Amino acid sequence: MEVLIRALGRADAAAVGALYQQSAAHLRSLGDDTDFQFDAHAYLRDGFGPRPAFSGIGAFLDGQLAGYLIYAFGYETDRAIRQLYVLDLIVDERVRRQGIGRRLMHYAATLCRDAGGGELFWGVFERNELAIAFYRRLGATEVGGSRFMHLPV
């Protein structure tokens, strides 16, 4: 199985949107009641232009998008460390457990290091035990002592 990892582009919008919808259906089946709104239109609107909100890398198998990782760079002031925030890591359910997610995370780690960063950071739905187990196998640990909050504006 030859997997090509490359930056995502505008032409990947439909495939990204389709994989996102597959992931949203999986999370709903686990009880996630988020109003999942990301789609090909949001990908194009927010990922490109003069001030893109995120970047992405894709794993391609036989020319088809098999998985992707969308990220944004950030900074953690308490520890004075640059971070790569993983917004989404999604692998097509038909090709899971074949190393695609691992390869995307390793590629993201390289992007982070190359940008002067020191860690990857992300959130995971608390009932997504398969994802949590995968991240633990990578060596990730849970962050304690903080709660994530949001405030619509």
Predicted regions and their residues:
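A short, internal acetyl-CoA/4′-phosphopantetheine-binding micro-motif in the GNAT/acyltransferase core
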Residues: L89-R96
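Conserved GNAT-fold acetyl-CoA-binding loop/helix
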Residues: Q21-R45
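A short helix-loop-beta-strand connector motif used in the catalytic cores of GNAT acetyltransferases and
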Residues: R45-G58, Y85
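Conserved beta-strand-loop-alpha-helix junction that forms the acyl-donor binding cleft
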Residues: F121-A131, H150-V153
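Conserved active-site alpha-helix within GNAT-family acetyltransferase domains
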Residues: R102, H106, D114, E126-G145
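Conserved GNAT acetyl-CoA-binding A-motif
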Residues: R113-G123
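A short beta-loop-alpha structural element at the N-terminal edge
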Residues: L4-A18
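Conserved beta-hairpin
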Residues: F54-G67, D92
